[in-house]
């Protein structure tokens, strides 16, 4: 039997935005396809495995109010919940949940696989053309051809992605994952301008190497909080986070390493994120701070 690769909507990229876009389109009753380079990395939590935070928590709950998946999946994968900014008025409170990143990805994939009108295809889009009948034709790296009335691009960091680890530069969308160079090329040929944005990813630490007796516990809230109005109870056991403060010895190590930092050796033309700076940025921006905190 010949596979029908004709859809009303095709979503390219299965990160958080792509998952919500594909789910929303399918629930509207249109034939939808979600194309991703790796089905095992759907809704991958690449950075800090958390949902919410100041301002972002309100957005996550608005997505839930509009019928999205993020809130329900977060509640299913949450291992610690906190309501931030409680020292301010209720309008400033912001929910945040630390999540099991593997559980989050698997739960999102399962929800999408059980959504009517939605199919998932693992491949890389290499070419997009618009025919005279206003139908888009997509070709993939592995030779498949798709047709769609509408295309939603949610490629995130994969469009001509470049990763920096110290002085080393490697093409890719995430560690050990290739960037989408072909798609970027054809978007530029279609007249779209490309630019480069920056994000940073914290290191992963083996918990077996941490002396927790020297750290301060950072516990979550014991009463049940949730992101989705649909969720009824916590699913996973709640875990502790930890805080630690740096000292003069650590600061000296960081200063010696500044020539290897892409933000400070000219490799990256950016000032970095405002509210989530790297530890070396804290050192440079706030030199008078003797013990800035770190969170594990």
Q: What are these language model-derived features?
A:
Residues 3-17:
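Beta1/beta-strand and adjacent pyrophosphate-binding region of the FAD-binding site
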């Amino acid at each position: 039997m010949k596979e029908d690769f004709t859809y009303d909507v095709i979503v390219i990229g299965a990160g958080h935005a792509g998952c919500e876009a594909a789910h929303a389109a399918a629930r509207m009753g249109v034939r939808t396809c979600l194309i991703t380079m790796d089905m095992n990395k759907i809704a991958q939590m690449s950075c800090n495995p958390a949902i919410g935070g100041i301002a972002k928590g309100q957005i996550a709950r608005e997505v839930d109010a509009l019928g999205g998946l993020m809130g329900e999946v977060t509640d299913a994968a949450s291992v610690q919940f906190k309501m931030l900014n409680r020292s301010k008025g209720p309008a400033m409170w912001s929910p945040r949940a630390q999540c099991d990143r593997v559980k989050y990805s698997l739960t999102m994939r399962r929800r999408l696989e059980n959504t009517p009108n939605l199919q998932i295809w693992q491949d890389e889009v290499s070419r997009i053309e618009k025919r005279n009948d206003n139908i888009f034709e997509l070709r993939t790296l592995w030779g498949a051809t798709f047709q769609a009335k509408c295309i939603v691009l949610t490629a995130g960091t994969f469009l001509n992605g470049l990763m920096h680890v110290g002085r080393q530069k490697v093409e890719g969308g995430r560690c050990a994952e290739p960037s989408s160079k072909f798609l970027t090329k054809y978007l530029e040929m279609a007249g779209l301008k490309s630019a480069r944005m920056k994000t940073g990813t914290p290191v992963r630490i083996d918990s077996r190497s941490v002396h927790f007796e020297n750290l301060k516990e950072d516990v979550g809230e014991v009463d049940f909080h949730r992101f989705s109005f649909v969720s009824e109870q916590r699913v996973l056991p709640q875990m502790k986070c930890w805080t630690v403060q740096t000292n003069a010895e650590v600061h000296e190590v960081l200063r010696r390493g500044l020539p290897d930092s892409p933000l400070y050796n000219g490799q990256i033309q950016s000032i970095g994120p405002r509210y989530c700076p790297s530890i070396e940025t804290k050192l440079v921006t706030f030199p008078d701070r003797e013990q800035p905190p770190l969170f594990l």
